[in-house]
Design a protein with these regions (language model features):
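A charged, aromatic-enriched C-terminal amphipathic alpha-helix characteristic of glycosyltransferases
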Residues: 15, 351, 364-399
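A short, active-site helix/loop in glycosyltransferases that binds the activated sugar's phosphate group
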Residues: 119-170, 178
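Nucleotide-activated donor-binding/catalytic signature segment of Leloir-type glycosyltransferases, i.e.
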Residues: 242-283, 288
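Nucleotide-sugar-dependent
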Residues: 290-310, 319-332
Length: 402
């Protein structure tokens, strides 16, 4: 099958970009042809985070460049829209994208990565895209996107697809796949080469990523135990004004982490956006990696973030929010993550962080136990969200519904 992939928002360097990178790897490894088109009408802070050398970047606002995308998309068997232009894109870009929707002739798949209605409202031409799509994917069949689809199409947005002649549209849940084995082969270090005193949080300057909880854990538990905590991914966005009021920290957002001397018994060190490949190399050398995101149950279903997966792939001990484990269902075991055995994960409870610290401390003193834990985490999350399962499942749904 030949697939045309559209990144209407452009290369924003976050989840959708990572999804596209992993998606195209899976397509290539499984005998599919693909071409990726991305808008370059708007520039993003993290645009250099990933290698996107295989992406055709176009000015959507220019009709002659949009013509190239329309022609290329119509030469494919299916068109997958990974993201839409934002309402902040130039008006000409949005209008040309709408022309694209009207002039393409092949089946359309729309993958909506946003969770909440606030994020969904930032998408331009979303109603036109939903109505044009033959297949719709979302992180959850009960999230705000499902409600939006119901409001647009008059259907419930749940369950199996209805018969074609009813024009009913429902949401199919998806998980963003990643090639666990390939990432492990590139970054995983012997346990002797990991530094148990180093603790690394990765995320963005948005509150649901859990930076408040990381500050608390460092200030009240890790710092006095001789740990060094680094944050990576913090931008000086409007949300940074609130971020900097939460706790004291060593701010180095515009500096290279390699040039900073990290010392014990210090406030956490805070660094800015990263190049993914360089970050993964740094992660692979620390003892504990923190992904402390938390979303409401209706947004999650089975989906974990790419940064959850990357920690498990890199060979560190993953520390995740306990409440996330209580809300997310394992793809294979069909149980909440927290209720599964041998997760290899430290679950951090917002209300009582002592048990997580006790386990972190115990692991830091026992390299054999630590190695067993990270191996368990790798296998557990690979079975949950490896691309060999998730993208195969997605493609099966696409083939059955176009």
């Amino acid at each position: 099958m030949k697939v045309a992939i559209i990144m209407g928002r452009g290369i924003e360097g976050c989840g959708v970009t990572k999804f596209t990178v992993e998606q195209t790897k899976w397509l290539a490894n499984n005998g599919h042809e693909f071409v990726v088109y991305s808008s370059k009408d708007k520039s993003w802070t993290r645009k250099n985070s990933h290698d996107v050398s295989n992406v055709v970047q176009l000015k959507f606002a220019k009709p002659e460049e949009m013509n190239k995308m329309i022609t290329g998309a119509n030469e494919a068997d299916v068109i997958i829209i990974n993201s839409l232009p934002s309402i902040g894109h130039p008006e000409a870009c949005i209008e040309q994208y709408k022309r694209f929707l009207n002039e393409i002739t092949k089946p359309v798949v729309l993958i909506q990565h946003d969770h909440s209605k606030l994020s969904i409202r930032r998408n331009a031409a979303i109603e036109e895209s939903v109505k044009r799509a033959n297949v719709l994917f979302g992180h959850s069949k009960t999230n705000d996107f499902a409600k939006y689809v119901e409001s647009v199409t008059g259907e419930a947005g749940l369950g199996s697809f209805l018969d074609e002649d009813t024009n009913g549209k429902s949401i199919i849940g998806f998980q963003p796949g990643i090639d666990f084995d390939a990432i492990r082969a590139k970054y995983w270090k012997p346990i002797e080469e990991t530094d148990v005193d180093m603790h690394k949080w990765i995320g963005r300057t948005t509150s649901w990523k859990g930076y408040k909880q990381m500050f608390k854990f460092h200030n009240e538990y890790l710092r006095s135990a001789g740990a060094i905590t680094t944050f990576e991914g913090i931008e000086k966005s409007p949300a940074y004004l609130a971020f900097r009021e939460i706790s004291e920290f060593n701010g180095h957002i515009s500096e290279d982490i390699a040039n900073i001397s990290l010392q014990k018994n210090q406030p956490a060190y805070v660094f800015g956006p990263y190049i993914n490949d360089e970050l993964m190399e740094r992660i692979s050398k620390v003892g504990f990696g923190y992904q402390l995101s938390l979303l409401d149950t209706r947004f999650i279903e089975r989906s974990i973030e790419y940064t959850h997966c990357e920690l498990a792939c890199a060979g560190v001990i993953p520390v995740f929010r306990k409440h996330y484990g209580e809300r997310c269902t394992h793809r294979y075991y069909n149980k909440k993550l927290i209720d599964c055995d041998n997760t290899g994960t430290v679950w951090l409870d917002d209300e009582n962080m002592q048990p997580a610290f006790d386990l972190v401390y115990k692991l830091s003193k026992d390299p054999v136990m630590r190695n067993e834990y990270r191996e368990m985490a790798f296998e557990f999350f690979k079975l949950h969200q490896d691309s060999q399962y998730t993208f195969a499942e997605m493609m099966k749904h696409i083939e059955e519904n176009i």
